[in-house]
């Protein structure tokens, strides 16, 4: 009897393992040898019976290899297929197309945490295949706006300029605007290492098990991919991170899949496993370039700078998958990273991204050239949902007032610095001298911190008060009198 049970368990395990890796689409399948043309990443087939939009197909090549594709456009009996692994080697004589009859789905399991996948969702860490608990459509299910919960409760990143002045709340989508040569990878990795829930009164679950990071990389080089993977492993954070890596030498079209697969994983962990998921997507500029390549191959009418006219709505299908839902404790917070071509914030990619997302964090080249890390310029940075996640019972009662005062003083100090270059330091007033002192200490003490330095929100606020004490009380007009009387003295009570 015991032997029969063992055999049954072994058989069940084998069947489950096969189910995780097999092509689970409908059977029998139709096969077509009617490839009429190959253009860039696209393959055109003719005489197809009832082709369906977004249907997944398998292309069999003459060397017995297979490639996956997706029907991108249907016109009568003609279908245009977008091939994920590239079209080199596909011909119209020996290659044929097998139609599945289903859309692209991703096997999901909480075992995906701690694993590394390629841009198509296949394991590349030499580990076993995922035993799926469920198969989910990578395009996700639209969230009823009526069922959305307003984002609140702050996520602590350990970086003072973000936590104090551009606070990120659970369920928010806020991008990092960077440029070529700036340390956005280091900032992204640091946030991945340090991100956690603020230990406030309203946080029900303080354990790290309730927090996960999904990292999707698009078009990164081998060095960057190795850096992220090695950083997570060395700092013991890998077990709470799920990595999807599309390298620069991987097919360009795969970059269109990568963010959707990453977000599908995040939705499963957030809404099925009720975890708080922090999603980092880098680099969204590579995604937009892949979108432009497909649009060009389809000979569509180009929009600004050659990007397709529908790029705004396409980006929204990615960014709008962040948020919280009624009846679920989990949340998805998005932190996409994009590099602005030629440092141009008016470029279509950052321009359209800024319309959709709830603020932005700006990485500044001038600060970086002065060896300030992280080189985050707080003046063009903004978090539109910051007010709902800070203050009494969430961080500290003085948080919003300190943030406003820091912004005000830093902006005035920049004006004084520009005026000093014109009229000289001798012509400045005593108040102007205080602002210049504040500017110097703000950049050296508040903005600057070590790559592995994790400041909690209370440490960052205390540093901010040290800087504000440069000024007499009557110059701190953004802070209420009762807050000043409590926190302005050097030995204040928390």
From Swiss-Prot:
Described purpose of this protein according to its UniProt entry: Non-catalytic subunit of the peripheral V1 complex of vacuolar ATPase. V-ATPase is responsible for acidifying a variety of intracellular compartments in eukaryotic cells.
Gene: VAPB
Cross-referenced SUPFAM superfamilies: P-loop containing nucleoside triphosphate hydrolases
GO terms, molecular function: ATP binding; proton-transporting ATPase activity, rotational mechanism
GO BP annotations, alphabetical order: ATP metabolic process; vacuolar acidification
The protein's name in its UniProt record: V-type proton ATPase subunit B
Keyword presence, Transferase: no
NCBIfam families xrefs: PRK04196.1, V-ATPase_V1_B
Entry annotated with the keyword Cytoplasm: no
Subunit comment: V-ATPase is a heteromultimeric enzyme composed of a peripheral catalytic V1 complex (main components: subunits A, B, C, D, E, and F) attached to an integral membrane V0 proton pore complex (main component: the proteolipid protein).
Record-linked InterPro entries: ATP-synt_VA_C (IPR055190), ATPase_a/bsu_AS (IPR020003), ATPase_F1/V1/A1_a/bsu_N (IPR004100), ATPase_F1/V1/A1_a/bsu_nucl-bd (IPR000194), ATPase_V1-cplx_bsu (IPR005723), P-loop_NTPase (IPR027417), V-ATPase_su_B/beta (IPR022879)
Family designation: Belongs to the ATPase alpha/beta chains family.
Keyword line: Hydrogen ion transport, Ion transport, Transport
Any single Pfam family the record assigns to this protein: ATP-synt_VA_C
GO cellular component: proton-transporting V-type ATPase, V1 domain
């Amino acid at each position: 009897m015991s032997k029969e049970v063992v055999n049954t368990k072994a058989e069940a395990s084998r069947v489950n393992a096969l189910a995780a890796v097999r092509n689970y689409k409908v059977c029998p399948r139709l096969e077509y040898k009617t490839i009429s043309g190959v253009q860039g990443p696209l393959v055109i087939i003719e005489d197809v019976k009832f082709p369906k939009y977004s249907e997944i197909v398998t292309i069999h090549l003459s060397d017995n290899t297979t490639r996956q594709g997706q029907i991108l456009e249907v016109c009568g009996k003609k279908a245009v297929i977008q091939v994920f692994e590239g079209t080199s080697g596909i011909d119209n004589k020996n290659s044929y197309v097998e139609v599945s009859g289903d859309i692209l789905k991703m096997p999901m399991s909480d075992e995906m945490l701690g694993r590394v996948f390629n841009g198509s969702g296949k394991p590349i860490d030499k580990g076993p295949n995922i035993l799926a608990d469920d198969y989910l459509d990578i395009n996700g299910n639209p969230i009823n706006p009526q069922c959305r919960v307003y984002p609140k409760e702050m996520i602590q990143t350990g970086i003072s300029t973000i936590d104090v002045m551009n606070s990120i709340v659970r369920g928010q989508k806020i991008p990092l605007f960077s440029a070529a040569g700036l340390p956005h990878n280091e900032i992204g990795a640091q946030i991945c290492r340090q991100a956690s829930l603020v230990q406030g009164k309203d946080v029900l679950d303080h354990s790290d098990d309730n927090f996960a990071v999904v990292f999707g990389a698009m078009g990164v080089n081998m060095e960057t991919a190795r850096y992220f993977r090695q950083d997570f492993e060395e700092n013991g954070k890998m077990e709470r991170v799920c990595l999807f890596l599309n390298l620069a030498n991987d097919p360009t079209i795969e970059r269109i899949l990568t963010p959707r697969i990453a977000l599908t994983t995040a939705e499963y962990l957030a809404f099925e496993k009720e975890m708080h998921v922090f999603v980092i997507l880098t680099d969204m500029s590579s995604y937009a370039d892949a979108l432009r390549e497909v649009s060009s191959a389809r000979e569509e009418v180009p929009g600004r700078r050659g990007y397709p006219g529908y790029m705004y709505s396409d980006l929204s299908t990615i960014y709008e998958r962040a948020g919280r839902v009624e009846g679920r404790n989990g949340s998805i917070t998005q932190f996409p990273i994009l590099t602005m071509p030629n440092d141009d914030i008016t470029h279509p990619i950052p321009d359209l991204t800024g319309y959709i997302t709830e603020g932005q964090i700006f990485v500044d080249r001038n600060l970086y050239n002065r060896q300030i890390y992280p080189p985050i310029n707080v003046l063009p940075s903004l978090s539109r949902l910051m007010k709902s996640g800070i203050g009494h019972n969430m961080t500290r009662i003085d948080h919003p007032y300190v943030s406003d005062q820091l912004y005000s003083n830093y902006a005035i100090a920049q004006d004084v610095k520009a005026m000093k270059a014109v009229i000289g330091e001798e012509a400045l007033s005593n108040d102007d001298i205080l602002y210049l002192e504040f500017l110097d200490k703000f950049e050296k003490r508040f903005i600057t911190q070590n790559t592995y330095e994790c400041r909690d929100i209370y440490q960052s606020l205390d540093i901010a008060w040290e800087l504000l004490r440069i000024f007499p009380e009557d110059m701190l007009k953004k802070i209420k009198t009762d807050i000043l009387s409590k926190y302005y003295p050097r030995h204040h009570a928390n």
